[in-house]
Amino acid sequence: MNPSTTQARVVIDELIRGGVRDVVLCPGSRNAPLAFALQDADRSGRIRLHVRIDERTAGYLAIGLAIGAGAPVCVAMTSGTAVANLGPAVVEANYARVPLIVLSANRPYELLGTGANQTMEQLGYFGTQVRASISLGLAEDAPERTSALNATWRSATCRVLAAATGARTANAGPVHFDIPLREPLVPDPEPLGAVTPPGRPAGKPWTYTPPVTFDQPLDIDLSVDTVVISGHGAGVHPNLAALPTVAEPTAPRSGDNPLHPLALPLLRPQQVIMLGRPTLHRPVSVLLADAEVPVFALTTGPRWPDVSGNSQATGTRAVTTGAPRPAWLDRCAAMNRHAIAAVREQLAAHPLTTGLHVAAAVSHALRPGDQLVLGASNPVRDVALAGLDTRGIRVRSNRGVAGIDGTVSTAIGAALAYEGAHERTGSPDSPPRTIALIGDLTFVHDSSGLLIGPTEPIPRSLTIVVSNDNGGGIFELLEQGDPRFSDVSSRIFGTPHDVDVGALCRAYHVESRQIEVDELGPTLDQPGAGMRVLEVKADRSSLRQLHAAIKAAL
């Protein structure tokens, strides 16, 4: 076989040995050797291949697959702007610590700077956003060196996997694996008995890298009035389960003492234990910035968040002494009930349907075993305000840099991964539900994610709920939504679009319905085959009034 074909087959084989089970492929000419190798692996059942037209959405599909499966996922593309389109997904994967492998084909390096078509300096393009940038040299037509080249290629692939999974750093993230390929780019007619240079026996990786243990115990006295702030990427800490906890929807719930974020200003904690990285709620930011309140940061990796510079100590787990005062626990529980009641009462009293109403309806309709994917703007905040009980529910959201990009594709990837895991361990006839709650701008921004070819894997039970207030509702709640700017804010921040969601879905052959908010629960309970979109019309002009009423009720 020709050198490029040999190299591509070796790389794909080693990626599979290292735990890659899903690969997203974008079409191109220069990456043809990789495409042929991936198709062969898909046909033999070693991977599940997903072909997409748009590299930007492909990157987010890979993120959804990776966070849903907890495993590294590759996205493969040709050279040039195809690589640049992975920028947003790479940035998200960096800050969310997602093991995303960008597998890019490149032109031979001697063509750089010559004006050759579709050629750019793509190695190093992602700069500080990747854990590593690794390149393979051009494959040589040198049969006498096949064994040495095989070892070099497999070793480099294992370095890519170790960097992406954080095996030696406890800091998973994106890696750029750039492979220059020389023509011929398609397989030659192969003689009988032609084989790919072999890897280690029994399907083992060429270089095994055991996961690093990262353990930094931190002594914390719980007799001091304490609240826990559990953010994105938080670990599970059973010895903190008794403490009042403000948990973001994506954080694992490890206790039975939840604390509503709006209850925080009503309390005076004496210390804070911060788990993971908080990304929501201004009351949380205010508390973490209070110089009078010590903050202890517990993370699952080497980095820790500290926006205000107020963290007193960091570690990975708490070694606790003392016990929380019963009076403190009782007061926190009372304030939690008070905040939840205030939200529910004002929702019931408000005359118009808002995104918060939609989030409350979705939260109420969820059941254990569901997976929930949330848009990064208002939906993830609204679900938290609605008091979602996340016990038994997997909650996903792109909180790395909290952009609305690629959310439809992320939801599709998460659904495919969740269903795949269920098929391997449960009943393949009853796929678990994935429900995505996103805003209309988020939906429109990634509507091309709905484009799934007829030969590609498709979710068996994914419902995308679009809370459609015809624009950016979050700006109604920010400084830009102040009535002083009412004459211009609707256009330059609200960005109304008047998109016909149903027509857009029909263009992609996706089932869609427009329903009222009180129909959400019953409709979600109706089994849907495949992927569907439920659109709920909402009002954003009264959001500021609703949130002011909730605050006043507190």
Swiss-Prot record:
Keywords: Magnesium, Manganese, Menaquinone biosynthesis, Metal-binding, Thiamine pyrophosphate, Transferase. Pathway: Quinol/quinone metabolism; 1,4-dihydroxy-2-naphthoate biosynthesis; 1,4-dihydroxy-2-naphthoate from chorismate: step 2/7; Quinol/quinone metabolism; menaquinone biosynthesis. GO terms for biological process: menaquinone biosynthetic process. The keyword Glycoprotein does not apply. One of its GO terms (molecular function) is manganese ion binding. Its cofactor is Mg(2+); Mn(2+); thiamine diphosphate. Binds 1 thiamine pyrophosphate per subunit. It comes from the Bacteria. It is an enzyme of class 2 (transferase). It catalyses: isochorismate + 2-oxoglutarate + H(+) = 5-enolpyruvoyl-6-hydroxy-2-succinyl-cyclohex-3-ene-1-carboxylate + CO2. Its EC number is 2.2.1.9. Homodimer. PANTHER family: 2-SUCCINYL-5-ENOLPYRUVYL-6-HYDROXY-3-CYCLOHEXENE-1-CARBOXYLATE SYNTHASE (PTHR42916), PROTEIN PHYLLO, CHLOROPLASTIC (PTHR42916:SF1). Belongs to the TPP enzyme family. MenD subfamily. Catalyzes the thiamine diphosphate-dependent decarboxylation of 2-oxoglutarate and the subsequent addition of the resulting succinic semialdehyde-thiamine pyrophosphate anion to isochorismate to yield 2-succinyl-5-enolpyruvyl-6-hydroxy-3-cyclohexene-1-carboxylate (SEPHCHC). This is 2-succinyl-5-enolpyruvyl-6-hydroxy-3-cyclohexene-1-carboxylate synthase. The lineage of its organism: Bacteria, Bacillati, Actinomycetota, Actinomycetes, Mycobacteriales.
